[in-house]
């Protein structure tokens, strides 16, 4: 009889990728995924530490799991093995056992390949096991090839960690230094996902455009080299990459946007602030003019490119004038979509130690103003697509039985009626008939 594995994933696409790899890793040991936590023999939380709210979700979920464990005990059933993985695990380590002593395993992002052994030890009644080693090569060398198809759109992790040390960010401390997978590993995984039906691959990294992996004859491949190499794979129709840092937008990568048709005309390029003073305080290593120059060069190379970004409001020392600079940058760039957040002090980062923290109510006011501007831009872009014909990759079911959802080259979600789901996994021409701020509606032509 198979054992059941339940994984709940918080945070970034890298965590989503890691969750798939955990399924592949544990399947040979008899664990099959389940969407019902009550059936699980092993429960894994893949956690995010980028903001305080995200980290606290871990403990809220652990509290709910504790109630489930208590119910099982009353019914005379075995307890599930509880694993906390991801960046909260790496950042807080033993503290997790203090706050949630019923947790069995704490494992960091670079040590997932040890999960079968750790779980086996818990089965043998060992408790409070922890593995937070930072050996990036070991992770990629030991993770299995794909067993579970990811569908029409797949993630592949090609780079982990970050050397930039932005003063608001925990990633260098939870994911470690920048490390790139070798080209052969990535190419082999790409062939595997395409052979199982993927039409689109998104290359992932905390700082993906800093990729510098070894290729044949020990040649160092840039991200542009890697994308060009993968573009040669038959039946692979779309390529994307995220998340990028502005200072690593190299000439060859910008040029590739104009020469490689499989590279989608959409780029997520976080800037975080439009104020030079705040950019310097964040240690972003560039100013707003540098960012504008990249945007201009991208648009000259690929006129139809659409941009996305991340913004943080209320970083320590941010004045009304600094915030106005951010609004000015947003209005000048004109984004297709964006993500915006209030600054959240993270323990161990330089930003958290500053004495000029912005009051919470001011952060909230600024976030509301910024999000209104960003939502208006996103709606305007979506409305500009009404009446056009777009190629849509349908990759998931909708809320209703006769509905499926796909995405345009610009990462917009498109809803259509397709009762027999015959278009799932396919790229199809769709006429856009309606726009909302977060989605489009269309008809197959």
From Swiss-Prot:
Q: Which residues form the Radical SAM core domain?
A: 148-380
- According to the entry, every stretch annotated as the MTTase N-terminal domain falls at 3-124
What cystine linkages occur within this chain?
none
Q: Which EC numbers does the record give?
A: 2.8.4.3
- Cofactor(s) listed in the protein's UniProt record: [4Fe-4S] cluster
Where the record annotates domain TRAM, the positions are 383-445
Quote the subcellular location field of this record.
Cytoplasm
Q: Which CDD domains match?
A: Radical_SAM
Binding-site residues, [4Fe-4S] cluster 2: 162, 166, 169
Name one molecular function that GO assigns to this entry: 4 iron, 4 sulfur cluster binding
One Pfam match, given by its short name, reads TRAM
Primary location class: cytoplasm
**What cellular component terms from Gene Ontology apply here?**
cytosol
Q: Which reaction does it catalyse?
A: N(6)-dimethylallyladenosine(37) in tRNA + (sulfur carrier)-SH + AH2 + 2 S-adenosyl-L-methionine = 2-methylsulfanyl-N(6)-dimethylallyladenosine(37) in tRNA + (sulfur carrier)-H + 5'-deoxyadenosine + L-methionine + A + S-adenosyl-L-homocysteine + 2 H(+)
Organism superkingdom = Bacteria
Q: Which residues bind [4Fe-4S] cluster 1?
A: 12, 48, 87
The function of this protein is: Catalyzes the methylthiolation of N6-(dimethylallyl)adenosine (i(6)A), leading to the formation of 2-methylthio-N6-(dimethylallyl)adenosine (ms(2)i(6)A) at position 37 in tRNAs that read codons beginning with uridine.
| Subunit comment | Monomer.
PANTHER family under this entry? CDK5 REGULATORY SUBUNIT-ASSOCIATED PROTEIN 1, MITOCHONDRIAL TRNA METHYLTHIOTRANSFERASE CDK5RAP1
Q: Which family does it belong to?
A: Belongs to the methylthiotransferase family. MiaB subfamily.
This chain's protein is named tRNA-2-methylthio-N(6)-dimethylallyladenosine synthase
Upper lineage is: Bacteria, Pseudomonadati, Pseudomonadota, Alphaproteobacteria, Rickettsiales
Q: Which gene encodes it?
A: miaB
């Amino acid at each position: 009889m198979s054992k059941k594995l339940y994984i709940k994933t918080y945070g970034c696409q890298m965590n989503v990728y890691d969750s798939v790899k955990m399924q592949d890793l544990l399947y040979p040991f008899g664990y099959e995924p389940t969407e019902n936590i009550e059936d699980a023999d092993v429960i894994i939380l893949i956690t995010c530490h980028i903001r305080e709210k995200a980290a606290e979700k871990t403990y809220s979920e652990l509290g709910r799991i504790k109630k489930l464990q208590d119910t099982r005990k009353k019914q005379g059933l075995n307890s599930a093995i509880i694993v906390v993985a991801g960046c909260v695990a790496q950042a807080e380590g033993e503290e997790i056992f203090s706050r949630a002593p019923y947790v069995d395993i704490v494992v960091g992002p670079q040590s997932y390949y040890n999960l079968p052994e750790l779980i086996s030890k818990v089965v043998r009644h060992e408790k409070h096991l922890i593995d937070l080693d930072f050996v990036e090569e070991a992770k990629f060398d030991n993770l299995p090839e794909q067993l579970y198809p990811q569908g029409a759109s797949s993630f592949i992790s090609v780079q982990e960690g970050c050397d930039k040390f932005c003063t608001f960010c925990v990633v260098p401390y939870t994911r470690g230094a920048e490390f790139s997978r070798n080209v052969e590993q990535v190419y082999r995984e790409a062939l595997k996902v395409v052979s199982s039906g993927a039409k689109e691959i998104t290359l992932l990294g905390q700082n993906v455009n800093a990729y510098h992996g070894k290729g044949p004859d020990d040649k160092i491949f840039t991200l542009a080299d890697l994308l060009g190499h993968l573009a040669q794979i038959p039946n692979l129709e779309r390529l994307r990459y995220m998340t990028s840092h502005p200072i690593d937008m190299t000439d060859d990568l910008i040029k590739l946007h104009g020469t490689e048709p499989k590279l989608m005309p959409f780029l997520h390029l976080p800037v975080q602030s439009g104020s030079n003073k705040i950019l310097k305080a964040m240690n972003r290593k560039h100013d707003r003019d540098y960012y504008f120059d990249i945007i201009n060069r991208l648009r000259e190379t690929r006129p139809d490119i659409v941009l996305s970004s991340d913004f943080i409001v209320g970083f320590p020392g941010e004045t009304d004038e600094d915030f106005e600079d951010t609004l000015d940058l947003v209005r000048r760039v004109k984004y297709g979509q964006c993500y915006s957040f209030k600054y959240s002090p993270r323990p161990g980062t330089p930003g958290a130690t500053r004495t000029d923290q912005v009051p919470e109510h001011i952060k909230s006011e600024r976030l509301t103003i910024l999000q209104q501007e960003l939502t208006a831009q996103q709606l305007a872009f979506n409305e500009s697509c009404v009446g056009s014909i777009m190629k849509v990759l349908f990759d998931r079911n909708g809320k209703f039985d006769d509905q499926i959802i796909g995405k345009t080259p610009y990462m917009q979600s498109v809803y259509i009626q397709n009762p027999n789901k015959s278009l799932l996994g396919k790229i199809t021409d769709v006429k856009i008939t309606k726009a909302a701020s977060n989605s489009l509606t269309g008809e197959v032509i």
